[in-house]
């Protein structure tokens, strides 16, 4: 038995859940987009095992209900595979984890090859499936799937940043390369066995949300930035006025 990838989930914020819910409702621009999106999700959320009899078995996990629905919808709709699902709840954090099993069913190897996860005769493909990404809309779908599978976006009124926990350096570098032509300079660090791709520039995060076609989320974060900017300006003026009053009192004393 060997493992292809294991998703080390980032903590989920309420904004992250809303973004993923929005992304889960987006249909790609061409028929291939659905395959590409599923390919990204399976690479990041899936653990692939080779059984003793030579067949494959995959278990996918996510803490987001909307993403679990996308997994099941795409696997059923594209390939007609059965996907038994169980739900686990942490007694300490009360977090739900959805576990979706994909037994071989006589065709899982073909599914994995169709999605570019394995290459017949050469084994697993750990980077991005470049053969599936010739169209712009498919590159968008791959990034969208990657964020649904491993993404996190922080509160824009605080330390605003966006991250994706990815299964390996090669996949992280591949996605970072996909983002460059769109004006997004993503960086990579390593945390708890995952390669974490991150973006900290507000403008680049907005570009990334637009790339994924999360237009509602763009409006949400832009509105939050305006509120934060207004609060900062009010605080600056109040502090300046207090400083002026202190100087006046000191001069009069």
What is each stretch, according to the model?
Residues 11-57, 61-71, 75:
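N-terminal, positively charged regions that mediate nucleic acid binding
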Residues 3, 48, 186-188:
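Short, exposed beta-strand/loop patches in secreted or surface proteins that constitute
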Residues 1-9:
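Single conserved hydrophobic/aromatic residue that forms the stacking wall/gate
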Residues 48-53, 122, 155, 232-236, ...:
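Short acidic (Asp/Glu) and glycine-rich catalytic loops that position anionic groups and cofactors
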Residues 62, 68-225:
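DNA-contacting interfaces and partner/effector-binding or oligomerization modules
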